């Protein structure tokens, strides 16, 4: 099975979702998954060493702002899906392309967006 994992949302310090992805990807490879990863340029060396059998696809634009990453997720990620034709897209950070051509697995690490929306900004309340 070919899985495309969108690792573009992980923070530079690999905290939180980054730690989850960091622990997940070697297990996917060990289980026989043909793993492709969309990664930020700054993470190429890390994931090349962590999972040398994964196919890395560095994103070409800066993902420093949330808006830029989300725009890429809705435009660049579908283009990458079309190009490499994975069986499944795994989005480990809540969001995924609105238009997608493959089954999607989304990991929710925190459900308070739904159970306690008042704890989040108005933008996140509406978005999630």
Located regions from the model:
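Carbohydrate transferase catalytic cores enriched for Leloir-type hexosyltransferases
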Residues: 1-128
């Amino acid at each position: 099975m070919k899985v495309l994992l969108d690792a573009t949302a992980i923070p530079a310090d690999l905290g939180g979702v980054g730690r989850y992805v960091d622990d997940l990807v070697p297990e996917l490879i060990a289980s026989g998954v043909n793993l492709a990863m969309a990664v930020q340029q700054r993470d190429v060396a890390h994931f090349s060493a962590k999972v040398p059998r994964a196919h890395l696809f560095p994103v070409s634009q800066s993902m420093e702002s949330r808006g830029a990453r989300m725009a890429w997720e809705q435009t660049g990620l579908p283009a990458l899906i079309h190009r490499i034709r994975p069986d499944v897209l795994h989005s480990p950070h809540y969001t995924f392309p609105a238009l997608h051509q493959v089954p999607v697995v989304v990991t929710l690490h925190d459900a308070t967006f739904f159970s306690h929306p008042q704890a989040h900004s108005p933008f996140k309340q509406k978005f999630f």
